[in-house]
From Swiss-Prot:
Keyword RNA-binding: no
The protein's role, per its UniProt record: Forms part of the ribosomal stalk which helps the ribosome interact with GTP-bound translation factors. Is thus essential for accurate translation.
Protein name as annotated: Large ribosomal subunit protein bL12
Organism per entry: Francisella philomiragia subsp. philomiragia (strain ATCC 25017 / CCUG 19701 / FSC 153 / O#319-036)
GO cellular component, one term: cytosolic large ribosomal subunit
Listed HAMAP family: Ribosomal_bL12 (MF_00368)
Coiled coil: none
Amino acid sequence: MSITKEDILNAVAEMSVMDVCDLVKMMEEKFGVSAAAAVAVAAAPAAAAEAAEEKTEFDVVLVDAGSNKIAAIKAVRGATGLGLKEAKDAVEGTPFTVKEAASKDEAEALKKQLEEAGAKVELK
């Protein structure tokens, strides 16, 4: 009669925590593996998700001026304080970073302002 997976599971369930730790160490040595590597790999996606959630600074990038370039130039001038020629060059030379490291609220407000002028904007 061979031992089934269910028998092994029941035997492990009856062990103390220290005995289970010793068993894990013995299995690592016997099979040449590390249980810590599997844990680190599983934790990596969670850490990446936390980093994405914690993003507080955004770059506001003008991707396209749209059909009304004059309105886009005015919006860029108002947002950046650039002169007329510099704002015109920026709008015509898209993509152009309008504002770097803006707070979420500031970036959203700026994006809304530029989109109302007909421009296509991305937050990065």
